[in-house]
Design a protein with these regions (language model features):
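Bacterial N-terminal signal peptides that target proteins for export
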Residues: 1-8
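Structured interaction patches on ligand/partner-binding surfaces of diverse proteins
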Residues: 22, 85-91, 113-149, 236-267
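Intrinsically disordered, low-complexity repeat and linker tracts
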Residues: 20-34, 262-290
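Short amphipathic, basic-aromatic surface patches that mediate peripheral association
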Residues: 24-28, 34-62, 165-169
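Conserved "repeat-terminator" motif of extracellular CCP/Sushi domains
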Residues: 151-158, 216-222
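C-terminal motif of bacterial Sec signal peptides marking the signal peptidase cleavage site
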Residues: 15-18
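Tryptophan-paired
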Residues: 60-120, 172-253, 280-290
Length: 290
């Protein structure tokens, strides 16, 4: 298995969650601890693991794909129960609750964030930093008195922006500053549509030797969503060594907006060539060359 030199969500943690306030779960209702309830849900994910070459997800257990999972039960859009898991839990990916007979809305989430998302509102699931590769399921279920065991298929719920710096990073670069406009860390699981946009300025990311690829994730708020990304490398004395503006980057659900560009060539902004290329791990790649 090849491991690309990629700085993943350290940056996304700072960019995406900045202006959308993360609201902690209400303390009046704690998550379910039922082991053998009358609803048992097992999640499956048959998409190739993002960033891994020549290896199918079918061979990768969920606890190697994600670090956290949540199952949330709503009735008439009101949350009635939920379960949060971490990948060290026994039977990670299988969750159980005990419910009164009736019809419910089921949401299942899988991600690798540092905290479980806020799930109080059925139509607004909010993630804290960092936003990672998120998979989700939504559907209606009918629960009776007898045990009901179901399997659900998770689908990717985000878009990804991948920046590949094509020139050498000067030795005197100490950290990067990213300004990112037009992203979302909240979405409606019933539609997989992102809800709010965020902007964050002046976030300092320490340079990691050899890392020239950065991956950022966002929920997609609509077909016309455009993202502006400004990148600058600074010296230890906080002098700008090089900078680049990437305006109007389109993002689409389950697609990668891939940017191949120099950052330290002295050109602040340039034209883009855009093409869509099929990819095994995502629905497609929107390829930008600056």
């Amino acid at each position: 298995m090849k491991t690309p030199k990629t700085l993943l969500l350290i940056i996304a943690a700072l960019l995406f969650a900045a202006c959308e306030k993360y609201e902690a779960e209400d303390v009046a209702q704690t998550e379910s601890k039922v082991v053998d309830g009358n609803l048992v849900v097992t999640a499956e994910c048959l998409v190739t693991k993002s960033g891994v070459e020549d290896e199918e997800t079918a061979t990768l257990p969920l606890n190697e794909r994600f670090t956290r999972m949540s199952m949330v039960i709503y009735q008439n859009d009101v949350r009635v129960d939920y379960v949060n898991q971490v990948n060290t839990d026994k039977d990670f990916g299988t969750m159980s609750v005990d419910l009164e007979p009736g019809t419910y809305q089921l949401v299942v989430l899988a991600h690798s964030g540092t905290r479980s998302p806020t799930t109080t509102n059925c139509h607004k699931i909010s993630f804290s930093a960092p936003l990672t590769d998120v998979f989700s399921y939504y559907g209606e279920i009918t629960v009776g008195k007898e045990a009901n065991k179901i399997s659900v298929q998770l689908a990717r719920a985000v878009a990804k922006i991948q920046l590949n710096i094509k020139d050498d990073i000067p030795a005197n670069v100490s950290f990067f500053n990213f300004i990112y406009k037009g992203a979302s860390v909240s979405f409606d699981p019933t539609t997989k549509v992102g809800l709010a946009s965020s902007t964050r300025r002046n976030m300092e990311i320490e340079k990691v030797e050899g890392v020239k690829t950065f991956e950022l994730y966002t929920f997609v708020t609509g077909a016309d969503q455009l993202v502006d990304l400004d990148v600058a490398g600074y010296s230890e004395a906080k002098d700008v060594v090089g900078a680049k503006k990437f305006p109007g980057i389109s993002v689409e659900l389950r697609k990668v907006s891939k940017i191949d560009s120099p950052v330290f060539d002295g050109v602040i902004e340039g034209p883009t060539d855009i093409s869509v290329i099929l990819d095994d791990t995502w629905d497609g790649v929107i390829d930008y060359t600056f």
